[in-house]
Amino acid sequence: MGKLHSKHACKRRENPEGDSFVVNGFIAKRAAEEGERYGNNLKDYKNEELKDSQPTLLHCPLQVVLPPEKAEGCESFLQYLSPDDEERDAQKVTKRISLQDLECNVSLAEDNRQEWVFTLYDFDNSGKVTKEDMSSLMHTIYDVVDASVKHSCNSKRRSLRVKLSVTPEPAARRRDATHTERETSHLSQVEPVRSEEHRSADRRQSTHIRGQTEAHEGNHYCVDENTERRNHYLDLAGIENYTSRFDSSSPDADQDPPSRSSHSQSRPHSQEPETHVYQRRSQLMEPCVAPDPRLRTGPQLIRSRSPKGSSRYPGVIPNVTKTSKCHGHHQPISAGQDVYHLTQQSHTHAHTPSGLQHSHSRRIRSRAREQQALTPVKNTNATALVQRHEHHHHHEHHHHHHYHHYHQT
């Protein structure tokens, strides 16, 4: 077999996944030449081969490079084989930072610095930080920062400055006053502002709530007291309560018989003769006649007050309990009927929009008085005028008492 067959026979591959045997063609050619030179003398071949191969092995130094135990600098990855390179590059190695010297701050005397600030808020849920927590946390932060900044060491060298400041939680800031000097100095600047804000906010809130309650109570009390005082003096003067004419659903005006009875008892006796005059004149009035259609107010119904609310005299029960459908007129009145109820109804009729206005001229009043004096009570309009006239004099403090006797027959 020739050289070509033997060379191709050396390149034998059994399995693509492994067990492959490859021989370089240069080594095979050199082995064939040496075999032709020395023949079958294997001893001479081995010795000659070793003598010739010694200088070539010295030119290829072999060295096992192990990874560093802990990378503490950018230049620790480089391994220098020649002594000249090691001496030349040894000057470029920077200072190595030991963790024993590191407590809170690490600073190197260089211009370009990168500062990292970590602020923790009550990480152990107790409001206090011990020295063990600080030291373990500081070492952990330094290791993490050192490992994360290694990839940028080839571009430009920088010094790392790690600063850790521990600040208590705002809730613990008020209840715990035993901190370090740094925390105490920090609290001396922050605490007055926060306490003043909380104090002013609490003061505003309490003042607002207290002011609302006092305003509601004070307004209610003032309104009730002023209304009662005003009603009392109006009743003493013989004038109807102005608010009771329009607000019929008011509990102060409708559903307070004791107060009205007490007011009625305190009235002067000068009004009693007038009450008898009203009763005598009401006995002479005729029953209600069908009124003129022009004086009717379409959908308006006149409500009479309830017997409970309108009774000013204790023991006197009025007979009128239904609404009067005659505009300006009343049902027959008995001797024991409430006179103020009658005057208030007539005053309510006087304010209807279709009837005559409350403020008549003196000419119309005098004409109505002359008509009433000459003829009996026949015209319903005259009756309405007389009643309105009487009610008007009742509101004007009874300046015209002599007219009341003038109408009697």
From Swiss-Prot:
Transmembrane among keywords: no
Keywords: Calcium, Cell membrane, Cytoplasm, Lipoprotein, Membrane, Metal-binding, Myristate, Wnt signaling pathway
InterPro entries documented for this protein: EF-hand-dom_pair (IPR011992), EF_Hand_1_Ca_BS (IPR018247), EF_hand_dom (IPR002048), Nkd-like (IPR040140)
A Gene Ontology molecular function term of the record: calcium ion binding
Residue ranges with Basic residues bias: 389-409
Compositional bias of kind Basic and acidic residues: 171-185, 193-224
UniProt: Ca(2+) binding residues: D122, D124, S126, K128, D133
Keyword Nuclease: no
Subcellular localization, as worded in the UniProt entry: Cell membrane; Cytoplasm
Region (Disordered): 160-224, 243-315, 346-366, 388-409
GO BP terms: Kupffer's vesicle development; negative regulation of canonical Wnt signaling pathway; negative regulation of Wnt signaling pathway; Spemann organizer formation; Wnt signaling pathway
UniProt GO cellular component terms: cytoplasm; plasma membrane
Main location, first listed in the record: membrane
Coiled-coil regions listed: none
Lipid sites, type N-myristoyl glycine: G2
Tissue: Expressed ubiquitously until 1 dpf, when expression becomes confined to the anterior CNS, with slight expression in the developing tail.
Domain EF-hand: start-end pairs: 109-144
Biased composition (Low complexity): 247-268
Known role: Cell autonomous antagonist of both the canonical and non-canonical Wnt signaling pathways.
PANTHER family in the cross-refs: PROTEIN NAKED CUTICLE (PTHR22611), PROTEIN NAKED CUTICLE HOMOLOG 2 (PTHR22611:SF1)
Similarity section: Belongs to the NKD family.
Protein name, UniProt field: Protein naked cuticle homolog 2
Organism: Danio rerio
